[in-house]
Amino acid sequence: MKMAEEKKGFFKRLVNGLTKTRDNIVAGFDSIFSGYSSIDEEFYEELEEILIMGDIGINATSAIIEKLKEQVSEQHIKNPAECKQLLIDGIKDQMRVDSTEYAFENQKSVILVIGVNGVGKTTSVGKLAGKLKDQGKKVILAAADTFRAAAGEQLAQWANRAGVDLIGGQAGADPASIVYDAVAAAKARNADVLICDTAGRLHNKKNLMEELRKIYRILEREYPEAYLETLVVLDGTTGQNALAQAKQFAEVANVNGIILTKLDGTAKGGIAVAIQSELDIPVKYIGVGEQIDDLQKFDADAFVNALFDVDEKDLGTEE
């Protein structure tokens, strides 16, 4: 019951947080569905324009519209209003990805968290630590983003809030050596999850690749029994830039999932559709606020429902 209540509460926040995106997309749709008396090429072009403006991305949009055209033709649909549910289902289909498991919840794990400055990376690490701690896990944080002076202090505050141990080093210290120390601590203290806050200097890809390679090597050598998850943090307010960043990180790291932050108050929430559709990398968590519990597991169907403000009456039926 508590789970259902929490989920309902989060869905409500998601609906509120996506207000700008919804105004951007849905208001346009409604005027098209009510403003057109027949389905023609102009009708499709208008829909396409709204999807692209909502940051759903050109490729995903083309696929959604093509599928809609096929269905309209097959089902001999004449009334534009009948396209709305088909469109919602089409967006959900575009967001299907191969794997959305949270394998790190069920075994000894290391989670590497990467992302450029300013996306809310360190905050996300802190919130994720709190989330896993609430699940009864022993969590250790590693402050391996030594490039940004304030990152360590910020992470220390989050570790304090979440009630978890933190392994850090001096500003400018070698991130790989901090990860090495953190692995030793994780093993000695029998931690379930070690979360490493690592730098993400995309403008210097060569250095970033080297740094990540070193970290991966240490983890393989020192902690081969741990499952490794790499999460990229992206700022939802940056729209297509976030997609470009995700692509670049996927080139240098084995990315298992995305944390999409700052979705409250952005008109670019459609980027979640573009990421899953184009990269086949699941968005695993989304942030819609500043509180420690404002990082929640991502549910693509609930997200699209919130985008269209579809009533989630049966929200409490699943975990």
Annotate each language-model stretch with its function.
Residues 1-100, 106-113, 128-130, 134, ...:
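Non-catalytic terminal/linker segments enriched in charged/polar, low-complexity residues
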Residues 92-95, 100-319:
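P-loop/Walker A NTP-binding module and the surrounding RecA-like catalytic core of P-loop NTPases
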